[in-house]
Amino acid sequence: MSAPTLDVESPLAASTSSLRAMNMVSSHTTVAKDEIYDLLGIGFGPAHLALSISLRESSEANETNFKAHFLEKRGHFAWHPALLLPGSQLQVSPLKDLVTLRDPASTYSFYNYLHSHGRLARYINKEQGVPSRREWTSYLAWAARRMNQAVSYGQDVISIEPLALASASPDAKQDTVAVRPASAQEADSLCLYQVRIRDESTGHIVNRYARNLSVAVGGVPKLPPAFQAAWDEQQRAPHSIPRLVHSGFYIPSMLKLEPELHKAASLRHPDAAAQLDDSSRLRLAVIGAGQSSTEMFMNLHSRFPSAIVTMIFRASALVPSDDTGFVNSAAFDPERTDEFWQASETQRRKWLQEFKRTNYSVVRTDLLNELHDAMYDKYEVQLPEELQDPTEKQAGRMEMRRCTEVVEVTPLDDGIQLTMRDNLRNAKLETIRFDAVFLGTGFIRSPSKMRFLEQLKPFYPALDAEWMSRDTIAEEDEVSKSIDVEDEEVIERRREMLRGITRDYRLVPASAMQSDAVRSGKSSPGSGSDASSTSSQQTLASENSTENLPEASLYVLGGNEATHGLSDSLLSIVAHRAGELTTSLLQRLPRTRRGTASSAATQPAASTVASAAKTSPTVSVTQTKARQAAQVVNDKLAALSGLHLDATS
């Protein structure tokens, strides 16, 4: 099978139009059609790596010459490199790799990686049922190397400008297309994105054009409120020694910080043979009670055995993660995404709260037991002095401050001062100086935090944090009570409008937000079917646009926990979702190109999605009946003016 066009675009060569259009489009400009990508993916972690493989293995993508490429800011592939600590284990089954849930026969599976490296039998003989994080990183890097032609590294996306057709009737026979800057008031005419990219090695800036964008760039550090000002101050001095370290930067930060801490320790205690007291020891704090906090806690004790390392958290105890079969199935199986999507907001919130124990502020049981046993043996079991190893007298300690909250953070020249409230002792306040503080407080994965999407905020309400935080419980609950098989298309439309995103991860444009019709299930005054036709263009899979340049779509991955479930940012779903995205992208090709492909999607991803559709009316309508149903939906919306969409209407 020949590879689709995504495999011939590396490295990104500066094309004629790219060099000609170094700045954002100020008026009309022309773009060569052969320079337009069907998809540009921003970020190249597991989510987009899985998608690139799915596209390569898709027969339909080959037949239609689907042109895709991915951009990664780092100079090479990496997966959570900041916490690649010795002994750290993967927290998910290795069968939830890049491909297996989409196509178990793919050569990009974890087990084929082991086989190709001649160690499948040795892996089977391992006692641990999951690979180390080190081995999983090696697997991902192996797959990424095989996809090298699909990605350009060292490419920083600066901004994205939405473009519209300059002519209402473009000439399909021309090799170029005329475009102009799009207006948020006419987002339904948005047909292209201009992506401005800086090459990190040369500083050169080029523009690329794409019909579809997919964003999967991970998250930004989530900081407790008390730490925000100190963090911001430190960020303004990027070349200084970091005393406040988030887990997302742990190993790179330690390259600077560790020598400084060892130097400070030797200055305080120049005589290595003398007895150490607490005033001479390094003091290090770890904030949080989850997996990353625990790993940093143990690693810091290993790096600085004579230091006092304190773990500070609000909970009563460290809690094990629930990775039992029933819970894993209920929270992370692929079909749960459909179940979650179709549920009301009230039900989705309950599920998120219920299944937090699988992923948030929890620790793998084996690591938890290892830590508990080490602390018990070291601090509870006392040997007679004559039997003690001489180094024990110099040893530091690990300690935990549970039920404790940090209320004030004061940066110092050589450390951080924390004021803490001890909720076990009548909210008593205590202030302690630490040489460094480490935050295992998680990440924020909202697309509203991505600066390069700033120009698109007027076009997509879901990019606005305030819009996303509005209360829609009543409207969502009304939708869930209104479900009628006959009107499933209408119900699906309302879900998309309320959430600002579709089931297949496309953001809903502002022009589709007919607020009266969306929020009450009514057509707005004077709207009728014409008003809702704009909505139908933007949602489901309908295309009321030119044959050669359908409407542009923005896919967002990893920031949709509230609408698609806990697995959205996790490895559990990447393979299956890659198949869904492949199907969605191919369905949105121009009609003239779709006609060149065989009628059936022959890749396993398509069959996987089709299988899911049998149990999900939403997926079935979205992926197989949307275009035929669009006009029917519009007629229904008009006919239902003034009526709620319930079974008795």
Curated annotation (Swiss-Prot):
Per the record, what are the reactions this protein catalyses? L-ornithine + NADPH + O2 = N(5)-hydroxy-L-ornithine + NADP(+) + H2O; L-ornithine + NADH + O2 = N(5)-hydroxy-L-ornithine + NAD(+) + H2O
Task: Mark out the compositionally biased spans (Polar residues).
Answer: 537-547
Provide ranges: composition bias, Low complexity: 520-536, 596-611
UniProtKB keywords: FAD, Flavoprotein, Monooxygenase, NADP, Oxidoreductase
Residues holding NADP(+) = 289-292, 314, 359-361
Q: How is the cofactor bound?
A: Binds 1 FAD per subunit.
One annotated GO molecular function:
ornithine N5-monooxygenase activity
EC number annotated for this UniProt entry: 1.14.13.196
Q: Binding positions for substrate? A: 96, 328-331, 359, 572
Report the superkingdom from the record.
Eukaryota
Question: Which pathway does the UniProt entry assign to this protein?
Answer: Siderophore biosynthesis; ferrichrome biosynthesis
Which residues does the annotated region (Disordered) include? 512-547, 585-611
User: So where does FAD get bound?
Assistant: 72-80, 91, 157, 569-571
SUPFAM superfamilies of this UniProt entry? FAD/NAD(P)-binding domain
Q: Which prosthetic group or cofactor does it need?
A: FAD
Output the GO biological process annotations, alphabetical, semicolon-separated: ferrichrome biosynthetic process; intracellular iron ion homeostasis
PANTHER family per UniProt: L-ORNITHINE N(5)-MONOOXYGENASE, MONOOXYGENASE
Q: What does this protein do?
A: Catalyzes the conversion of L-ornithine to N(5)-hydroxyornithine, the first step in the biosynthesis of all hydroxamate-containing siderophores, such as ferrichrome.
Q: How does it assemble?
A: Homotetramer.
Protein name (database record): L-ornithine N(5)-monooxygenase
